[in-house]
Amino acid sequence: MDGARRSRLLGVWSLAVYLFLYAPLAVLAAFSFNRERLTAQWRGFTLDWYARLLGNTQVLTALRNSLLVAAVATVLATAIGTAAALAFHRHRFRRQGVLDALLTLPIVIPEIVMAASLLLLFAGIGLRLGFLTVVLAHVAFSVSYVVLVVRARLAGFDRSLEEAAMDLGAGPWRTFLQVTLPGIAPGVMAAALLVFALSIDDYVVTSFVAGVGSTTLPLQIYSMVRSGVSPEINAASTVLLVATALLLFAAWRVEQGGRARSAAAPAVLGLAILAAPFVLVGPPAPEDRVLNVFIWSGYLPPETVRDFEARHGVRVNVDLYDSLEALLAKLQAGNASYDVVCPSNYAVEILLHQNLLQPLDRSALPHLSNVDPAWLDRDFDPGNRHTVPYFTGTCGIGYRRSRVGEVDSWRALWDPRWKGRILMLDDARETLGAALRLLGRSVNTSDEPTVRRAMRLLVQQKPLVRAYDSANFEDALLAGDVWLAQGWNGEFARVMDLDPDLAYVVPKEGSTTYLDSLAIPAGAPHPKLAHAFLDFVMEAEVSAAICRSMRYTTPNRAALAFLPPAIRKNPAIFPPREVVGRLELLRDIGPATTLYDRLWTEVKTAR
């Protein structure tokens, strides 16, 4: 093979690699300008999603938090890392190799390990989760990068310049400020920009250590994905992507030194664009007039928040979680400061067992009488002493009628005719639960042989499954990527409004139901305001407005009078009585949770 041909082949391979890396990002950015909510169809150019993004207070607050955290963490990490780099480069001391390895360890250890260890540390010393813990965590994982970058710059630094300055009478500090620091400035600047980029992008560590009012933009975006990947999320991701790219480009150019430093201007411009919406976020309210809510994304309409703020003259901080495990971890750590949380029924059992919820004052909840008695006095919270019902729902099958006809059984998800067109939830309890109901067993069984039979059913089904996805199953069905999808009724109800060919069914073998409740954590800083919020969302008109917006089933009987017939008579939102009779609440199964998780892992890794 001649040189020209090898060169062309190398160019083709390089192009393929870059397309693989960057084509998805280009698609994301392009569809942030799509007029259609469905990302699989292009309906024309629009800037509406960016306008909506600028009007989203939660996103703007998260953006502000990201910028503040990144700025403070950058200053601290750069100062500490530069000092450490100088010390390790210029001095020799005992066990330096061990200390050097420990200093760079955060680069190689898994992020999840660092996140969990930091959460335990903060809980152990009684430090409340919030802005400070996020900053400290970001400094902890980024100092190592500063040390590596600055030491690389120090390797080429001529120390004779320092000696000459000191021979001329300059003291140590003057020598450092006027000789050393200017000489290593490109490395320091590059390290600072790298830290800023790492901080503003971080999700894993931040998700563990963030507390009240410290939700960052990555946390906000990831939580919003639970309601589907809308162009608004694409717009926010594009803004973050562009800013990060500018910062990394500037870091590389600054490290080159000389005239290349002028290339830092795009980074400054990117930061200015990001910071512009900051002024749109109002100043924080006094501490005693703040309500801190920790809830699922897509569960609390912004209009409801604004109405409560206007009525009570308070500010509501809404932080979002993407799994019940995240909620449990924050409350179990004991150093969060939330006033209202939204656990599912089996999470309530765990929280009550650990005394993490405070009793409710029923006299402050007159609108509890609006709730359907069928959803009150459940065995996970007898007498509703600690919780009030908020949303309920079912797990079933969403399907495309024109492709698969009418569906009434879980067996449709095992039908080889639909190979590659089936989607299952990435959820151990729900997915094993579907197999258990197909076997005629309870979704709450802890009998290992029975659960193993369900696991084997899922392994047999796996060649038919296109994906396991709990975040975007309804979008995959709407786009036509799959024709059958296991999922929850609220998400399917929203996309059924967009495509009449879509339908939802609770299989005849039965399925799971859940009851998400509102509760006040033990030690909540504003319990009176929390009671006012719980009572507010139980008002008939407020509950109806939430149901209209979110499309989940409201257990508020009085709200039905304020719902349009299209919602009130939609069986996907309000299942008929015969369907309710074959639903089973998910319960806390205690030690058997480990069994479910282990067997679900076997399903996911099966070939």
Predicted regions and their residues:
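Extracytoplasmic ligand-binding site segments that recognize negatively charged/polar headgroups
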Residues: 337, 342-481
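Membrane-interfacial helix termini and adjacent extracytoplasmic/periplasmic loops
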Residues: 38-40, 47, 95-96, 112-141, ...
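Interhelical loop and adjacent transmembrane-helix boundary motif
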Residues: 3-6, 37, 50-58, 199-255
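C-terminal transmembrane helix and the adjacent membrane-cytosol boundary/short C-terminal tail
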Residues: 4-12, 92-95, 151-162, 166, ...
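Glycine/proline-centered hinge or cleavage motifs at structural transition points of membrane proteins
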Residues: 168-169, 182, 391, 395
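Transmembrane-helix boundary motif in ABC transporter permease subunits
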Residues: 1-6, 71-103, 120, 248-257
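Early extracytoplasmic/lumenal segment of secretory-pathway proteins
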Residues: 283-351
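Transmembrane alpha-helices
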Residues: 12-25, 105, 115, 140, ...
